[in-house]
Amino acid sequence: MCALTSVALVSSAQLGMRWSMSRLPSPGQWLDLQDIGQVQSSAIAVICASITAYALSMLFWLLALRDLPLSRAYSLLSISYALVYTLAATLPFFHETFTVSKTVGVTLIVAGVLTINLRRISSPSLQDLSHENQRFR
């Protein structure tokens, strides 16, 4: 659960930063006090919220690493790629589009995550078989 919370937070942070950066002047102009009137306070607020979401995401990620094997936990981070792509292409204010190549790529990512993380109920793992084999020796 902590890993999925981390994924949700990092995905929302990515979307928030993208939304904000499309509404702010270029970073080179940020320190120019003459252009301070061009800065939207809502965009700054969303950037601050996004940075907070990243920090919270890291906290939840650390909690996830305490309980999950790294191979499973790390693969779950890939869900954020699929989530960000889908939301950016779905929400109208991002002006992103679905393409065949991106959709195929995201589908492969999701299939990989499912392959790694779904446990097969009917077939035991190799480790289980090894323990069972040693018990009968």
UniProtKB/Swiss-Prot annotation:
<keyword id="KW-0472">Membrane</keyword>
<dbReference type="GO" id="GO:0009245">
    <property type="term" value="P:lipid A biosynthetic process"/>
</dbReference>
<dbReference type="GO" id="GO:1901505">
    <property type="term" value="F:carbohydrate derivative transmembrane transporter activity"/>
</dbReference>
<protein>
    <recommendedName>
        <fullName>Probable 4-amino-4-deoxy-L-arabinose-phosphoundecaprenol flippase subunit ArnF</fullName>
    </recommendedName>
</protein>
<comment type="subunit">
    <text>Heterodimer of ArnE and ArnF.</text>
</comment>
<dbReference type="InterPro" id="IPR022832">
    <property type="entry name" value="Flippase_ArnF"/>
</dbReference>
<keyword id="KW-0444">Lipid biosynthesis</keyword>
<dbReference type="InterPro" id="IPR000620">
    <property type="entry name" value="EamA_dom"/>
</dbReference>
<feature type="transmembrane region" description="Helical">
    <location>
        <begin position="98"/>
        <end position="118"/>
    </location>
</feature>
<comment type="pathway">
    <text>Bacterial outer membrane biogenesis; lipopolysaccharide biosynthesis.</text>
</comment>
<keyword id="KW-0813">Transport</keyword>
<keyword id="KW-0443">Lipid metabolism</keyword>
<keyword id="KW-1133">Transmembrane helix</keyword>
<keyword id="KW-0812">Transmembrane</keyword>
<comment type="function">
    <text>Translocates 4-amino-4-deoxy-L-arabinose-phosphoundecaprenol (alpha-L-Ara4N-phosphoundecaprenol) from the cytoplasmic to the periplasmic side of the inner membrane.</text>
</comment>
<comment type="similarity">
    <text>Belongs to the ArnF family.</text>
</comment>
<keyword id="KW-1003">Cell membrane</keyword>
<feature type="transmembrane region" description="Helical">
    <location>
        <begin position="43"/>
        <end position="63"/>
    </location>
</feature>
<dbReference type="GO" id="GO:0009103">
    <property type="term" value="P:lipopolysaccharide biosynthetic process"/>
</dbReference>
<dbReference type="GO" id="GO:0005886">
    <property type="term" value="C:plasma membrane"/>
</dbReference>
<feature type="transmembrane region" description="Helical">
    <location>
        <begin position="74"/>
        <end position="94"/>
    </location>
</feature>
<dbReference type="Pfam" id="PF00892">
    <property type="entry name" value="EamA"/>
</dbReference>
<keyword id="KW-0441">Lipid A biosynthesis</keyword>
<keyword id="KW-0997">Cell inner membrane</keyword>
<keyword id="KW-0448">Lipopolysaccharide biosynthesis</keyword>
<dbReference type="InterPro" id="IPR000390">
    <property type="entry name" value="Small_drug/metabolite_transptr"/>
</dbReference>
